[in-house]
């Protein structure tokens, strides 16, 4: 506690403004437990940026932690581009203080003689990624904490290609940030270097989205859509892009249209959770809609709900949406005569392996990266000789084409409607399209189970779980022999039958994946953005007919239940 108080006392110096000093002094006087949480560590500027609770302290998002991160970025940009006029794009979401923080970040950049193009109002994250390329920027920054609780905010950094920072830039920027003291931040803004942007970038984005996300289909005017932005940024782009594409029956949830960092109508603004889409699904059932679209606050993730075999609106998981989208895109490329062996799709190590099966059936390669969309964006940069068709991950993110280099709920919403409209016009449905893929390839069933472990104790518990899984590896999972164990921290793939080890040629990451003889996959991974440890379960079995899909799903669900019980997690 003594070291924490000493650390906190430094925040009473003249480096910090009076508001910050008063906030810290009160915590010291009260000897508050909150003081410990605010100062027991520094909020890490990680490989994609920062995310944390707002407030004064080294373990919080505030003027000084954001200022230090930005100053480090400025220093790195100047060392990298010694003879260029630097330009950085900035966007922000609907969260509390996001607009203020974006202005602050712009001021630090301008103080360092860097030209800033700042969105005049909140905008989706994919539009920021697009703007970096469109406006020839050297970097981009978005102020967002995705779907975290209201007390959180965050800071993500993008590089010249519009993708989030990856090696070697990420470590070099982190080193620059860590070398600084708070007193090194230059807050002396140069307003003449800050330019506001908005409508002109929206227009360019809409055109690019329609170019990449629409195809030669029929039935757009007959598709009935319910859309919710969950109080976030997608309200700025999705209704308009659907209208321009020819979708006239779009019903928006009025109560959730207004951007609001408190997210007052939902427990969590996360479209991965069915509860977040309750209002939208209720309206869809009432009006007989075909599809429901819901996005998270910064509009990179999308939840898609469609009518199942019994006519009920059902939220698809990210893997299900991804396989249908991937198959549809490749079918379109095939019909246009564009598949020639020089294309690829992208996915991640914890996402469904069904994507690999589908791509292979079209003669298309699947490239697999670590968890996080930045690795899919990096593939585009690393393989310029190949055309990128699309890519996704299990956490409700998808990207269509390479005009954006991050998951893009806007164009994904458009693509989902194209799939649904085309299916409906042919007497089928989005859901039936999925079931047909299951009969063709195999019924893959996935489930994500997360455990929240907050604070210092929680971090220690998560560490212990991963150590135990490595020291005492599973030999069987639900009676099926473990054949391979992939340890991405050790960069090894071990054959559990022969004992042979191979190298994994991906950056190190604290992920462990078990593979069994019957095609089961179990992955364990601590979250990089939340105090959670995540377990990903994937099981599969052949499906003979669509009519047996419900029974097959129940069978596979029971298998996952058995595995969870067996692992005692």
Where are these regions (language model features)?
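An N-terminal, well-structured beta->alpha segment
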Residues: 8-105, 195-222, 233
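Gly/Ser/Thr-enriched, mixed-charge loops and adjacent short helices
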Residues: 11, 15, 34-39, 43, ...
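Conserved phosphate/anionic-ligand binding catalytic regions in large, soluble enzymes, centered on
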Residues: 39-59, 145-146, 229-241, 297, ...
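N-terminal small/polar loop signature for handling phosphorylated ligands or for N-terminal nucleophile
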Residues: 89-152, 248-303
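Short Gly/Thr/Asp-enriched flexible loops that form oxyanion-binding sites at enzyme active sites
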Residues: 101-109, 152-159, 300-319, 355
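Glycine-rich phosphate-binding loop plus the immediately following alpha-helix
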Residues: 158-186, 319-342, 347-357
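Phosphate-binding and adjacent anionic-ligand microenvironments
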Residues: 285, 289-291, 312-314, 332-525, ...
